[in-house]
């Protein structure tokens, strides 16, 4: 019985930890205000050298932001911007840009 109670408490703790670190796209949208000059609040790049972010996977976006933050990937602007982001900021930003649905119209 003690083992069952212990396992249940571990499971509950893991569930609470997951809920605390769940991505929040609304917070990400607020944070994206600093990204909008280059990447757009809608994730569609506003300058030629910036990539579109709309619809990219959360994992990809998180990986790239963490790489910029750590210096594993370098870019004059992104390295500086990413250094100021917490893990939670990165998760929320990735959730925002990943949540944007894009559609493509193929020319006739």
Residue spans for each PLM region:
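The canonical Cys-X-X-Cys-His
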Residues: 35-41, 93
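Bacterial N-terminal signal peptides
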Residues: 7-15
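C-terminal capping alpha-helices of c-type cytochrome domains
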Residues: 73, 83-108
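Gly/Gly-Pro-rich "capping" loops immediately C-terminal to redox-active cysteine motifs
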Residues: 43-73, 79-84
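Positively charged n-region of N-terminal signal peptides that target proteins for export
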Residues: 1-5
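Electrostatic cytochrome c docking/interface patches
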Residues: 16-32, 46-49, 62, 67, ...
């Amino acid at each position: 019985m003690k083992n069952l109670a212990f396992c249940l408490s571990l499971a509950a703790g893991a569930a609470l930890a997951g809920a605390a670190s769940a991505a929040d796209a609304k917070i990400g949208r607020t944070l994206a205000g600093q990204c909008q000059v280059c990447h757009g609040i809608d994730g569609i790049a506003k300058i030629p050298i910036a990539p579109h972010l709309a619809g990219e996977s959360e994992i990809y976006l998180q990986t790239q932001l963490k790489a910029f933050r750590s210096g594993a990937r370098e870019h004059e602007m992104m390295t500086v911007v990413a250094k100021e982001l917490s893990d939670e900021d990165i998760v929320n930003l990735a959730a925002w840009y990943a949540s944007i649905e894009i559609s493509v119209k193929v020319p006739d």
